[in-house]
Amino acid sequence: TLIDILQCLGTNLTEFFAEESDEQIVFRKDDFFVKKDTELHNTIEWIIPNAQKNMMEPILLTLESGGSTYLDVPHEGEEFGYVLQGSIQIHVGKKVYTAKKGESFYFTPHSEHYITANKTSGAKIIWVTTPPSF
């Protein structure tokens, strides 16, 4: 049968009949979507377009001095970040953690959480969530 032949070839019906599409691997600045929040003093750059349809969603977050992200409610998943510039405070539930340039953070978002920059300098971080939540 066709299924037996496809198994011998190391594929299946879905893969065999799927239309091939060119998957974009490299994304340039022109591909990014940028949103500036003047109230919270932050800028979010979605560095992978349409990442909401993927398993994880990376962003480049720039916080002005004293800037913050919005308060996020508890949800399933994982969150990871790497501080490129400055120093941040990660607020998870009632605890506050500090990370500075060259340091990273990771947590499961089972509590309300948000990030702030210190009042004297801003910060820039790569922040990745799974599943997508930005």
Task: Enumerate the language-model features and the residues they cover.
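Hydrophobic micro-packing sites on short alpha-helices
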Residues: T1-L9, L13-F17
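Ligand-binding loop in jelly-roll beta-barrel domains
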Residues: N42, K100-K101, P109-F134
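Short acidic-glycine-tyrosine-enriched beta hairpin
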Residues: I47, G93-P109
